[in-house]
Swiss-Prot record:
Mg(2+) binds at residues 199, 213. It comes from Bacillus subtilis (strain 168). The keyword ATP-binding applies. Heterotetramer of two alpha and two beta subunits. Interacts with BrxC. It is an enzyme of class 6 (ligase). Binds 1 Mg(2+) ion per subunit. This is Succinate--CoA ligase [ADP-forming] subunit beta.
Length: 385
């Protein structure tokens, strides 16, 4: 689950992580009142959407008066902001963060991520702050410093200091930088984060080390024990199809293609998308119905896929282990009848009760194309759309 920047800073502040003073505003009038409450003559007006790249897209403004704060707030609120992370449709700005301006001397990058290779949290840092870390990794990977953290003892002070020295934090501020990293790590672990990115971390003219931006993502599987984080959820920033899918325990992620996919198992779902791409198609979604899908669940999955106007065909790829092929077949037939499906539909079944499943499909009288293998199914759906 993602949250807004201002919410992330609220979380970090509780862990002693230094962040600029700021307030959220939903109207231009609130923006002015927020600015008035800050002890600063320079203000930063920041669009709050669940996407990066806001600065380059014009979503961050520097205001030197209350009149400018109001003008920028009126300009941004209600505007659709398009960044490299939003896609071409962009996201509508519904709230702003009004912050005090900072005297920035140098920008850095600090991030905590889960490293699947080591099954540990890794602290990453770079003196190339303010730019995309992916860009730094591609062009100057030697500028990214890492520390692998032992989960038994957590991030140690010496590791934080080593990282601070490695990215050339001024010597007199290494202690503050280390304290910052230790607070960030504590927040990461206690709040079940999957990503914590501070870009940029800044050193200010008055000798402070603070997070100028904060991106926190949380493990959705752990939210049951993070009630306070759940309160930060902003459904307006989420895909309505993904919200609907979650009601039925379906794992759905919308993509940009035109071939809808319904698969059981995350690994098979990713392989299905790969093979569609291999044969020249473009998947419209990732959809994992899981191992305990019922006919009702399959029907809802179909409805969610078809709510995407870009979908021109559907590929159902099921390997029945726990899942029974006849249950899937019944769900496919029921869903096809309920929604009045007119798009090409290719179904590949394999595993438990596969013969019964194929029989149900063939005797349904519906226009369903059967596939003998995953490759066969991918080629057929690509040729039909």
């Amino acid at each position: 689950m993602n949250i807004h920047e201002y919410q992330g800073k609220e979380v970090l502040r509780k862990y002693g992580v230094s962040v600029p003073e700021g307030k959220v505003a939903f109207t231009a009038e609130e923006a002015v009142e927020s600015a008035k409450s800050l002890s600063s003559s320079v203000y930063v007006v920041k669009a709050q959407i669940h996407a990066g790249g806001r600065g380059k897209a014009g979503g961050v403004k520097i205001a030197k008066s209350l009149d400018e704060v109001k003008a920028y707030a009126e300009e941004l609120l209600g505007k659709t902001l398009v960044t490299h992370q939003t896609g071409p449709d962009g996201q509508v700005i519904k709230r702003l963060l009004i912050e005090e301006g900072c005297d920035i001397k140098k920008e850095y990058y600090i991030g905590l991520v889960l490293d699947r290779a080591t099954s540990r949290i890794v602290l990453m840092a770079s003196e190339e702050g303010g730019t995309e870390i992916e860009e730094v990794a591609e062009k100057t990977p030697e500028k990214i410093k890492k520390a692998v953290i032992d989960p038994a003892v957590g991030l140690q002070g010496y590791q934080a200091r080593e990282i601070a020295f490695a990215i050339n934090i001024p010597k007199e501020l290494v202690g503050k930088a280390a304290k910052f990293m230790l607070g960030l790590y504590k927040a990461f672990v206690e709040k079940d984060c999957s990503i914590a990115e501070i870009n940029p971390l800044v050193v200010t003219g008055d000798g402070n080390v603070m997070a100028l931006d904060a991106k926190l993502n949380f493990d959705s599987n752990a939210l049951y024990r993070q009630k306070d984080i759940m309160e930060y959820r902003d459904l307006d920033e989420e895909d309505p199809k993904e919200i609907e899918a979650s009601k039925y325990d379906l794992s759905y992620i919308s993509l940009d293609g035109n071939i809808g996919c319904m698969v059981n198992g995350a690994g098979l779902a990713m392989s299905t998308m790969d093979i569609i791409k291999h044969y020249g198609g473009e998947p419209a979604n990732f959809l994992d119905v899981g191992g305990g899908a019922t006919a009702e669940k399959v029907t809802e999955a179909f409805k969610i896929i078809l709510s995407d106007q870009n979908v021109k065909g559907i590929f159902v790829n099921i390997f029945g282990g726990i899942m029974k092929c006849d249950v899937i077949a019944e769900g496919v037939v029921e869903a096809t009848r309920q929604v009045g499906l007119t798009l090409p539909l290719v179904v590949r079944l394999e595993g438990t009760n596969v013969d019964l499943g194929k029989k149900i499909l063939s005797e349904s009288g519906l226009n369903i194309t059967s596939a003998e293998s995953m490759a066969d199914g991918a080629q057929k759906i690509v040729s039909l759309v």
